[in-house]
């Protein structure tokens, strides 16, 4: 690792970082790890990436900054050695219904180019290959095919259009032509005055009568050129004896019928272009299914009383402001029964109109159109015209190797890769030259998707249906395909959603990025990824206020005591003083000075919980016994949605159950999209549409369903652990009961920061104010009035055990638990938060600052604090996302506690520490996509580890 350059970070203080300084090598594969909430993302994204983005923004003009905004300078003293940065995060790729895997990877763009340049057109009428010829080829073919035969040379001048064509007939007579073939009949021009104007006609003008021979070649050539000119590039030849007609054209034409097609262009195959999209669904593949009787079930009810169901009852909203304007313009009352209103008005409200209506009064009024309520109706069906392909019918006439572009886009990536490689011998010589470079680009990009474990996806898969992990790996594959160099890539847990089998491909892809001359920094908890790193950074030692320090920053081989070095790998003999030594206090292998002297001053080596797990000094132990369950089951019969193949499954209750399998094998389909919607509809009167299935059995054996995901506990900065757990109500009641509050007449509402009264009205109880700045980003500043304390001074004068309400909100949860230990209603809920490892989070910390793992554990704690019935089914989907080994140990403890209370926990997971700790596993596969959808193995972890049909079994065997 000689002569490396470094990114030097000095004094990083974003969020909980404690003046962190470190050096990270460039052009290396670096993993940043640490507990959930330790400051990993603060270092990687809020410091390094934010500074890189800010420097890029600084290069833009003031005018551009006005539209793009400016990133605030991160809280860091200095960063040097920074390259241009690309961050690839876990977020989904948005909800644009036109966006697909093919469009965001640009693979579909290359596919469109391939079809435009190298596809073969087939006649929709005869199924024969359509042809195109040059002028010389047409003359040669006529000379060859009709030698010595009497024939008519004709120019098609009208193709299937209505009209009397009186002027056209007269014009042709004046130009000296005497015959036409009209609708298949040969006619003399001087005998026809006009045609039936309401009938579609096919008119071919007889340009010459021929009997091709070599001596007449010049005349034939002149006649053909004249016919091509009149027929806009097409001619027809009719044998006088057999009356057989054959068509020749410089454009694509059916040789039997003369049907011609426009030359294909890339936009002809685009569902985002009018030239390519299905005219019925406009390229969306789906249409809104509108049943007016469902929208208006009772026409005797007025609009104001909720007669139009999606609108609800009349209220003060923008939508109803426009509807009131419509009512004024058409002179109707919204309080009259709908059956008495004009149909045109009801149609306008449902379907919308371009008509403008005045909304508002005086100078604030404006003219607006109404889009209708169609957009509020979510029931959509596959477009009956294009069958969900998004493309118009014309695209189906063009094929490569017998496949249309829609059929290719529907292939899984593995099939697509095989098909592309099979095309090498398919193209003719000319097409082969055209397709060569396009095919190379397609093969490369499809190969990158295979490398990141996305073999089960298809190009026509909507991006809105992708998980965050899938979206991130698609962006990673796209970046590998871009072949950029000297870039710093920062990735956020790319292993999410990946089976161990695919994770190794992902690591190889990350190293490929590095080997092309880039720096790769990955925020990750996956042990296999860490062990593959060149350099490891561990942020900690704890989380929240206990984190923010750099515990480790050093080459992995040094940390693990592996003596490999630049000199060792080149065969140089190691000096005698290069023996590894172990620090008896930290247990860490110390660096060999003679080998790593150039890196020694860049390293930080302290105590690290992460390294304890990597070296085996600490481990998450598998349970010594597996539960047998309570003898009852919850079963699904005939589950067949997505790729599920009529699956029958019985989940044993009273157990911790793992759902394993490769990505795309059907785990989410059977749990999240079949079982969960059925149970939500049953227990909570939801109106969800599960995937197809035959029946659910044993539903009477549970009485509640709880889904615990990683979504935020609140969507606004005002949500916090105190409000989420409900302890804030109890705390405010305590303050109301204090002597000071009673003397002042303060009720519990006085101590709320969400309503007027006791809160600071300058900042509305937020403690901060947002300052809007022209040409600069908005700035959050501490409120001058309350100095960030949220409340008025007289509210803060009321104290409980020496603390005011703001002091309580600023306490870490562990401190708050001790403070309220004698109040059971508060202590019980806070203890649950401490038990799940959230003692470091402040009681009043904004929900939007909590990580996904913290939010999930908060929800688990809320469940632990409740008095359950013991018959609850808990479902968790990849709960280890964002969790360190220590966090996973805590999470496992909570899940085991829930099962010990008699409940059932189903967890969809790839993490082996979780899977080896469950009581029973269902392994899905054998592959992803169409090759999946089956339960290939089930049983205890020990049974799976020895089951040859299990894909997960061999990996379990390594850890059991």
Give a label for each model feature.
Residues 1-960:
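Conserved phosphate-binding elements of NTP-dependent enzyme cores
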